[in-house]
Structures are given as C-alpha cells and as structure tokens.
Amino acid sequence: MPASPTIPEGLDLIPTTDGAIVRRVWLSWRTVPLALFAVVWDAFLVFWYWQALSRPSTPVMAVVFPVMHVGVGIGITYYVLASLVNKTDVAVARAGVTVSTYPLPWTDNRTLSADQITDVLVRTRTWSRNSTTHVVMYADRARKERRLVSGLSQSEQAEFIAQVVRQTLQIESTDR
C-alpha cells in the first residue's frame, strides 16, 4: 500500500497482510451532553412510573401515555451506550471491503467484493446550522451511490478512509 497521509484523530490504521483496517472509536466529547440528557430522561420516567404504580388506583392513561417516551428513552440510552463502547472497523483488502461495528450491534455492517466498488466518494450531510457529518460512499456497477461508512464528525476522517479504500483497491477517483 502506498504511503498514507497523517492519520486523523479518532482513527487508527492497522496494517494487515493484504491491506489495512481503519478503526474508528465512537467515543467523543459530543456524547457527554446526550448522556446527561439520557440520565435525566430515564430518571424522570422511572420516577413517573414509580409514582403511578405505587398508588392503589392509577388511571390507565398515567401508565399508557408515557410508553412512547419509554421507547424514545430506550433508543437514546442505547445510542449513548453504543457511543461509549463501539468501534467500527473498515477492513480493506484487494478482495474487497468489510465494515463491522462492535461490541453492541449496529446497522451498516456489510461485506463488499472489490468488483462491486467502482468509485469511492465523500459526502457531507448538514443536519442544522452547527451540525454536519461526513459519509464515505461507494459507487456500484450501476453508478448508484451507496453508503459505506457514516457518522464521521471530521471530513479528514472520511477522506482518509476513502483514500485507504481507493489505494488498496486501486481505484482512481472521478470526484463526481
């Protein structure tokens, strides 16, 4: 594999016999406010149900109404836990690319053979004025863009992953 540029913060490059693994640790300072919010949200719901179910005659709506909020709380808490412990490995070899996230299950795990990938691109997604994420996309044989790795907070991380994939698979970017 040709010389790589500086490895961006939050990524590790692990050489293998036929390519490399780019490892991204999810943990970042952005997790802290959401973790605090999850604690407050979940504590409120525990308090709510504690109060509602400790009374002898609780109205049904007092138990049913917050069920949707419990679902949201479970989702936020799972995301926070995943953000604290998960890693994503992008294993690139001449034969193809495997993306795996662990230890908590997450979406976007995939294995692609090299002949399925014709180009690798970086896209920026803007969610609000101050919130953007970067996505590494690949173009398939039909030239349709598909997500390879998402949720990257720094463009340098996305560009680095894209470059490692391009170099290992010997793809020349068309920068569509």
Regions picked out by a protein language model, each given a short descriptive name:
Residues 39-41, 116-118, 164-166:
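Short, charged/polar low-complexity linear motifs in solvent-exposed/disordered segments
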Residues 90-92:
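Extended beta-sheet lipid-handling architectures
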Residues 57-59, 66, 135-142, 166:
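A general structural signal for short secondary-structure boundary/capping elements
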Residues 2-18, 25-28, 82-84, 94-159, ...:
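Non-transmembrane, membrane-adjacent beta-strand/coil modules in membrane-associated proteins
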Residues 162-176:
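Cytosol-/stroma-facing membrane-proximal "stalk/adaptor" domains immediately downstream
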Residues 23-88, 174-176:
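Alpha-helical transmembrane spans
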